[in-house]
């Protein structure tokens, strides 16, 4: 809970263990499920190399162990190698989250040389036609497969991140086979979450309940069969769950995000909560923001939750669910996440499901493309 007594905040709030560094919002793909904010930051507003390096040093001093270099497409940054070196020198385990577009063999060599620990490669589909249609980028699948082969040849640990939805969930078994062929150590079967741009494509993307149940069965069988070969992270669609996820392990509990312009966020979608005020780095230090920032303290703990949550035996398991989803679906970020079957607003999720599934078969993608001016 937020510090309300005389103790220093460092005594009551745990240090973060992970940080997501959104180096840029620029991206060559146009995925209809993009979770980045509706308002994107152009190149001119991005933090420079030295400022990011300072952020990495401060993150390590704060207690962060894992750094995820993300975007947009982080390979859009010409200084990606320098940023990776700075992260490694700060002592952070560094993971690159990428579409693969922009990663040449020479660039992979340079990234490996400066200490990159891990790559997380996105996968839109298992065939060129499907993947290129979903990503809105012709030739993207072929380039991705070439990059994956280069990663495998170098022995860089690889996670494949497959965002699954109505159009590719039936291809899950082939997705698992492809992960093994590419030498991935982990496969994230991440059913699309409806935040940011993805909400515009809910009808086109939401899988059926039958697809979701089949996916659960396929993942469970594959986990047992491939134990020791391929690890799995399965994120089912929120809307079919009985209980919400423990979003971010609890607001302001385990991780923080830095947007391309230096805005420091408790979670990826936090800027959708309009009454919150967010601090920027380097205007304030990461330590100040983590422990004292108003946005980080707004929903820490469970005191803000309604009685439905506070009296529930799951309150310290899921922390009432996602604050951003509570706002989007219930109109109140302090409410019980309507995904929860015990929420008084759960009927709104049922209505969304019915509407999306009724109109989804013929729905077209609205692709995400960044305006050219930065």
Swiss-Prot record:
SMART domains with a match to the protein in the record: Elp3
Disulfide bond sites: none
InterPro entries in the cross-refs: 4Fe4S-binding_SPASM_dom (IPR023885), Aldolase_TIM (IPR013785), Elp3/MiaA/NifB-like_rSAM (IPR006638), PQQ_synth_PqqE_bac (IPR011843), PqqE-like (IPR017200), Radical_SAM_PqqE_MftC-like (IPR050377), rSAM (IPR007197)
Keywords: 4Fe-4S, Iron, Iron-sulfur, Metal-binding, Oxidoreductase, PQQ biosynthesis, S-adenosyl-L-methionine
Cofactor: how bound: Binds 1 [4Fe-4S] cluster. The cluster is coordinated with 3 cysteines and an exchangeable S-adenosyl-L-methionine.
One Gene Ontology biological process: pyrroloquinoline quinone biosynthetic process
Binding sites annotated in the UniProt record for [4Fe-4S] cluster: 27, 31, 34
Catalytic activity: [PQQ precursor protein] + S-adenosyl-L-methionine = E-Y cross-linked-[PQQ precursor protein] + 5'-deoxyadenosine + L-methionine + H(+)
EC number: 1.21.98.4
Entry-linked Pfam families: Radical_SAM, SPASM
Residue ranges constituting the Radical SAM core domain according to the UniProt record: 13-230
CDD domains, alphabetized: Radical_SAM, SPASM_PqqE
Known pathway: Cofactor biosynthesis; pyrroloquinoline quinone biosynthesis
The protein's required cofactors: [4Fe-4S] cluster
Enzyme class of the recorded protein, top EC level: oxidoreductase
Family: Belongs to the radical SAM superfamily. PqqE family.
Oligomeric form and interacting partners: Interacts with PqqD. The interaction is necessary for activity of PqqE.
Listed HAMAP family: PqqE (MF_00660)
Name by which UniProt lists this protein: PqqA peptide cyclase
Protein species of origin: Ruegeria pomeroyi (strain ATCC 700808 / DSM 15171 / DSS-3)
Name of the gene: pqqE
């Amino acid at each position: 809970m937020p510090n309300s007594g005389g103790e220093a905040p460092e005594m009551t709030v745990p240090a973060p263990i992970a940080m997501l560094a959104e180096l840029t919002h620029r991206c060559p793909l146009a995925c209809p499920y993009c979770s980045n904010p509706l308002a994107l930051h152009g190149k001119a507003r991005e933090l420079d190399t030295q400022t990011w390096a300072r952020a990495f040093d401060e993150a390590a001093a704060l207690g962060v162990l894992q750094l995820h270099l993300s975007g947009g497409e982080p390979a859009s940054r010409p200084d990606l190698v320098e940023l990776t070196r700075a992260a490694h020198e700060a002592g952070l385990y560094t993971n690159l989250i990428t579409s693969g577009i922009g990663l040449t063999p020479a660039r992979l060599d340079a990234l490996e040389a400066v200490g990159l620990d891990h790559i997380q490669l996105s996968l839109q589909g298992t065939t060129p036609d499907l993947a290129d249609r979903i990503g809105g980028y012709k030739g993207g699948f072929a380039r991705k497969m070439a990059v994956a082969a280069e990663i495998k040849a170098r022995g860089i640990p690889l996670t494949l991140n497959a965002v699954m939805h109505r159009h590719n969930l039936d291809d899950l078994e082939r997705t698992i086979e492809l992960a093994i062929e590419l030498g991935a150590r982990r496969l994230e079967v991440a059913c699309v979450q409806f935040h940011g741009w993805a909400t515009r494509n809910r009808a086109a993307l939401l899988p059926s309940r039958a697809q979701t149940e089949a996916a659960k069965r396929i993942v469970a069988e594959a986990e047992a069969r491939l134990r020791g070969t391929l690890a799995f992270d399965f994120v089912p669609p929120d809307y079919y769950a009985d209980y919400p996820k423990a979003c971010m392990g609890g607001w302001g509990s385990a991780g923080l995000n830095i947007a391309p312009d230096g805005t420091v966020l408790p979670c990826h979608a936090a800027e959708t909560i309009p009454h919150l005020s967010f601090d920027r780095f380097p205007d304030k230090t990461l330590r100040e923001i983590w422990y004292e920032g108003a946005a980080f303290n707004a929903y820490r703990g469970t005191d803000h939750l309604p009685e439905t949550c506070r009296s529930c035996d799951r309150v310290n398991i899921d922390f009432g669910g996602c604050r951003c989803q509570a706002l989007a679906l219930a109109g109140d970020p302090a409410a019980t996440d309507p995904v929860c079957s015990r929420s008084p607003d759960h009927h709104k999720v049922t209505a969304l499901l019915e509407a999306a599934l009724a109109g989804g078969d013929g729905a077209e993608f609205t692709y995400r493309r960044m305006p050219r001016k930065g």
